[in-house]
Amino acid sequence: MNLRDKLRGLLVRLYARRVEGHLDHAQVPKHIGVIMDGNRRWAKASGSSTVHGHRAGAEKIEEFLGWCSETDVEVVTLWLLSTDNFDRPQEELVPLLGIIEDVVRTLAADGRWRVHHVGTMDLLPAQMQTALKEAEEATAHIDGILVNVAIGYGGRQEIADAVRSMLLDAQDKGVSMEDLAESVDIDMIGRHLYTGAQPDPDLVIRTSGEQRLSGFMLWQTAHSEYYFCEVFWPAFRKVDFLRALRDYAARHRRYGG
């Protein structure tokens, strides 16, 4: 690292401390959703392989959760793999699944966070399913940030699965279709989502400059605030995180009003 890079790093850290010092902690979001985008483009820009980009993105996750732990954030949802990602070439998908499995095991072994899977288990390899179940069991007692790992996740699929779960639940209880139709409301459907009784995201961060949701938590983000960051996920810094919190705190949430 040359002198210019060292000086730039020092200035960024000083600026981050200044931003952090002016944060209103009463306005920190309780639930943050993250669309971690840009691993492949970061790798291409740095002359690295796609797999290296995914590994760099995976390594950023613990650092990010550490920043969240320094605030009053209570829930973080990380979108690690979408249902659409299964259409990627096998030479990319297979290593990516291995990297994600390593992430799950690392988060569970860390001991600071409670891990919960959101997504469709049926799409995942048996080894990944085992890792997720073991992570949930091993961290169920932890009184730290609840980390939703969205793996094999699609927003429309989640809603379809919620409706299916609701119908099956009614069938098990002997509820007629007529009675179910009369009793269905927003809260009932919400209870059958992957996130169940969790609070909806207050803030959704998407990296890489893309300004779209791509189906992320379609039901839960009806009143969420969004923050789009130009930085690719592997290059996401604490100062970028603090800027997102500052931007969120400055907004006036209307909840449709």
Residue ranges and their predicted role:
Residues 1-257:
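Flexible, compositionally biased loop and terminal segments
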